[in-house]
């Protein structure tokens, strides 16, 4: 089973593209949102409800023999391919975490088979964070007590964002076997290269501003005028590469109006991330276009860390669904998992004309 899941993740590295943003409402609600575009084929995705006291078993490249730990906190998380591989989630304290592919730049320390008792697979790191901690500093303090490994070097590395309900966010990247935490005051994250590179790259777009550019008179009788609204954003990159998505997400997030409530901000987050839905056919040569996948964006999730609600929609069903963590008794609830879609079909509301 683990080998099959790893094979699916290897396929995901061929078309990995995740975009994350962060918004704050006027009432103080904090909203973390992201897309997940993985693989050239439909992935098995679902959500899990993990209670307090649940025993988690970590994997290593040699099997189910990694660190075993008991959950301190309950959480809800979305997995891909295999239930323990949580890619985005939030726990009952409001701490949120997610992983984003980081190919060709991240590098973990070599696997040490003599240290299996403290070894965690990178795809299970989010689950470990959500089940054990309520603050970023607790995570940072615990890093020296674990070894992070990959199940297969062909899969490539990931990096992570961890977000407190206060709005503090860090990005964790492991390069040369050394973990690096970066405070993320911007709130945007995509994929490779590293987070600091993306921040530097924003300087290339210093001319960008919302609205329309002013008229420019070149000489008497010759005046250049905007051809439409939004000309202040001329030059904004529109392709699907990680650097371009980071730039777009930054400007869409920072120019977004601040809505009054968390609920309105959740809807705004979905609207912003509409711009990062990747149409099938745009990332592959015609002969390689995947079958049965309506969008490369397999799901989009939005988490209201203040209200403790996790929302999502999928490539097959764009209706928004919500899981309310406050309605869950994490002491009594049983561990459970469910597919994101009961049926992979878009519901359509028929309008009757009298």
Question: Where are each of the predicted segments found?
Answer:
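N-terminal signal peptide c-region/cleavage motif recognized by signal peptidases
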Residues: 12-13
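C-terminus-biased signal that marks the final domain/tail of proteins
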Residues: 16-31, 39, 44-45, 142, ...
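A contiguous strand-loop segment
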Residues: 17-114, 154, 354
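Structural recognition of the beta-strand scaffold that forms the well-ordered cores
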Residues: 31-33, 96-99, 161-163, 171, ...
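Compact, glycine/acidic-enriched structural inserts
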Residues: 48-66, 104-146, 334-344
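Aromatic- and glycine-enriched pocket-lining scaffold segments that form the walls
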Residues: 136, 140-174
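Aromatic/basic-lined ligand-recognition segments
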Residues: 174-178, 183-186, 194-195
């Amino acid at each position: 089973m683990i080998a099959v899941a790893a094979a699916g993740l290897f396929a995901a590295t061929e078309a990995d593209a995740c975009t994350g943003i962060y918004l704050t409402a006027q009432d103080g609600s904090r909203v973390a949102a992201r897309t997940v575009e993985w693989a050239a084929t439909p992935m098995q995705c679902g959500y899990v409800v993990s209670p307090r006291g649940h025993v988690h078993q970590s994997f290593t490249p040699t099997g189910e023999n990694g660190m075993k730990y008991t959950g301190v906190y309950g959480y809800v998380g979305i997995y891909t391919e295999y239930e323990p591989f949580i890619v985005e989630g939030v726990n009952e304290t409001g701490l949120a975490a997610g992983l984003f592919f980081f190919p060709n730049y991240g590098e973990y320390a070599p696997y040490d088979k003599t240290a299996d008792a403290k070894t965690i697979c990178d795809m299970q790191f989010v689950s470990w964070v959500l089940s054990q901690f309520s603050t970023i500093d607790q995570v940072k303090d615990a890093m020296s007590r674990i070894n992070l490994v990959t199940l297969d070097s062909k899969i490539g590395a990931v990096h992570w964002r961890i977000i407190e309900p206060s709005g503090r966010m860090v990005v964790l990247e492991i390069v040369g076997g050394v973990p690096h935490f970066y405070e993320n005051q911007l709130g945007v994250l995509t994929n490779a290269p590293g987070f600091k590179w993306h921040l530097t790259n924003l300087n290339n777009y210093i001319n960008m501003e919302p609205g329309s550019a002013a008229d420019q008179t070149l000489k008497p009788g010759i005046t250049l005028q905007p051809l439409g609204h939004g000309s202040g954003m001329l030059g904004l990159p529109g392709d699907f590469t990680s650097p371009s998505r980071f730039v777009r997400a930054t400007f869409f997030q920072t120019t977004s109006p601040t809505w009054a409530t968390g609920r309105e901000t959740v809807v705004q987050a979905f609207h912003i991330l509409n711009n990062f839905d990747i149409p099938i056919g745009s990332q592959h040569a015609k002969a390689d276009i995947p079958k049965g996948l309506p969008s490369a964006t397999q799901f989009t999730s939005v988490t209201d860390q203040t209200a403790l609600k996790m929302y999502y929609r999928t490539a097959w069903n764009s209706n928004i669904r919500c899981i309310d963590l406050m309605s869950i008794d994490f002491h009594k609830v049983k561990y459970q998992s469910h597919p994101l879609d009961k049926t992979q079909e878009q519901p359509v509301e028929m309008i009757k004309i009298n």
